[in-house]
Amino acid sequence: MTPKLKPMDDLRRVMARLRGVDGCPWDLEQDHKSIRFNAVEEVYELVDAIEADDDVEMLEELGDLLLQVVFHAQIAEERGAFDFDRVAQGITEKLIRRHPHVFGTAKVKDVGGVWKQWDAIKQVEKTGKTNERKSAFDGIPRHLPALMRAHELVKKARNQGLLPKGRKCRAKRKLGEEMFRLVQKAQANGWQAEALLRVETKRCEKVLRKKEKARQLTPRA
């Protein structure tokens, strides 16, 4: 009798079987690029479940998202690149490294301090690597939706002191209404709000990168 495996081990075994010699024809045809957008779709379905406060759906969608991780790890293992254990080990070590105020002796005053520390450690980690990030903005995914990309750009710029902190807005609904009105205005003119924001975000990113570079070149007193 086959000993009962832990659920995670069981999932990995099933995935390996699907990709085996006598596995599923569809699974065998896939590679990293052919399924790259599946993870994006699963994330949005998970967000829907979270916003609906639906635990049953959330449980299922978390499983679907986990499948994408296991699928990519299996393909990578077949290529001799890395396996799931390396993925799990990597993120575990990263969490410990990036939280020295929890696992070490570092001190931070608030959430803002946590983010600054995170970015500083991240920059050190990337130094010397083939994909070394020379800018704080290099890590923003190009395929993020325009609004999410703009949000990340502003957040990183403020963490770097390249943009003012800005005033707090207590009227969350009012801000949402203003944003929706802008979408209506764009649609009335035959423009895609997503495309407009993407272009403007790209323009602002160029300006911020220039400011960042100029500051890096300025000798410190």
Residue ranges of model-derived segments:
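Flexible "arm" and connector segments at domain edges
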Residues: M1-E61, L67-A221
